[in-house]
């Protein structure tokens, strides 16, 4: 056991993650023979088989799973040590790990430019995914801060209200409803809706609104991408309800129109959340403070 190295643990974790020696080698920029040799040495150091290879697939043994868990703990401890050292060096270097649901991609990157200029030595990672993917990252404590439109109720987390997040009804400019004013919700339910997938923050907020008004949405198509939804709306397949931020690239005078519908825009919010048990590094805390000092830079008024 004493002869096991950090590099061997890193290689083993990559194999477990990818399920393949070849993919692990590609991920770590190593040759496959090097990966195989590292695993032989680690297995010898541990003293028991760590994996089984059936066909091209790698399966961890019980001992292998224990080693994987230990390697994750080792990596976490080293990351914490790196953050401490960065803290002591006065933010001259360090890591900032952020994650946001897909709609956040329209404004979160805007926040990073000036911060990066102030702290050029900080390495920033921004993960973008759907709500379920981001919640899984949160549950596994993979990042420092998370941007969500609807915080989960089943996790012990800190929740900071950040920005307004108006949800609007959009249609192609050729749609007959574009010329109308004060469109009733009853008329809206007769229109084919193109919506995000069930479980997304936007979908949940809209479903709640329609339920409160005792109406049922006429969802004819589900798409897990805001950009694809906009293309479908532009193509005349229906109307949709999205965050106004999702129109940042086209602008409010672009090919898609915001309809004047009763009860809209739905005034929702963006939240920044993180685990209550998490001790934010100085890097993460500095960025959090920076966000609330510069939130006007990504307000709806500034973007549009």
Curated annotation (Swiss-Prot):
KW Cytoplasm (keyword) present: yes
Location in or out of the cell: Cytoplasm
GO molecular function term, any single one: transcription cis-regulatory region binding
GO BP terms: regulation of DNA-templated transcription
Occurrences of domain HTH lysR-type (ranges): 1-61
InterPro entries: LysR_subst-bd, Tscrpt_reg_HTH_LysR, WH-like_DNA-bd_sf, WH_DNA-bd_sf
One cellular-component annotation, GO: cytoplasm
Protein keywords: Activator, Cytoplasm, DNA-binding, Transcription, Transcription regulation
DNA-binding region: 21-40
PANTHER family xref list: HTH-TYPE TRANSCRIPTIONAL ACTIVATOR CMPR (PTHR30126:SF5), HTH-TYPE TRANSCRIPTIONAL REGULATOR (PTHR30126)
Purpose of the protein: Activates transcription of the cmpABCD operon under carbon dioxide-limited conditions. Specifically binds to the cmpR-cmpA intergenic region.
Family: Belongs to the LysR transcriptional regulatory family.
Identification of the protein by name: HTH-type transcriptional activator CmpR
Organism for this UniProt entry: Synechocystis sp. (strain ATCC 27184 / PCC 6803 / Kazusa)
Gene: cmpR
């Amino acid at each position: 056991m004493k002869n096991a190295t950090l590099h061997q643990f890193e290689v083993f974790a990559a194999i477990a993650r990818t399920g393949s020696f070849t993919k692990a080698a590609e991920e770590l920029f190593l040759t496959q023979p090097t990966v195989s040799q590292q695993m032989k040495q680690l297995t010898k150091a541990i003293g028991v088989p760590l994996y089984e290879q059936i066909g091209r697939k790698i399966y961890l043994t019980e001992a292998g799973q224990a080693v994987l868990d230990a390697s994750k703990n080792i990596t976490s401890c080293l990351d914490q040590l790196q953050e401490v050292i960065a803290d002591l060096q006065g933010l001259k270097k360090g890591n900032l790990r952020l994650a946001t649901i897909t709609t956040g991609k329209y404004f979160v990157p805007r926040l990073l430019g000036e911060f990066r200029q102030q702290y050029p030595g900080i390495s920033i990672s921004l993960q973008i995914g759907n709500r379920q993917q981001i919640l899984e990252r949160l549950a596994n404590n993979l990042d420092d801060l998370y941007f969500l439109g609807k915080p989960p109720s089943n996790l012990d987390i800190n929740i900071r209200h950040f920005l307004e997040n108006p949800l609007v009804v959009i249609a192609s400019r050729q749609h007959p409803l574009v010329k109308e004013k004060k469109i009733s919700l009853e008329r809206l339910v007769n229109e084919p809706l193109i919506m995000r997938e069930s479980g997304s923050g936007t979908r949940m907020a809209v479903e709640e609104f329609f339920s409160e008004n005792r109406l049922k949405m006429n969802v004819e198509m589900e798409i897990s991408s805001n950009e694809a939804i906009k293309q479908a709306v532009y193509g005349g397949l229906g109307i949709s309800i999205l965050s106004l931020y999702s129109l940042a690239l086209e602008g409010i005078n672009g090919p898609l129109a915001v309809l004047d519908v009763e009860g809209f825009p739905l005034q929702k919010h963006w939240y920044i959340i993180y685990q209550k048990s998490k001790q934010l590094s100085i890097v993460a805390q500095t960025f959090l403070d920076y966000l609330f000092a510069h939130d006007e830079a990504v307000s709806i008024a500034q973007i549009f």
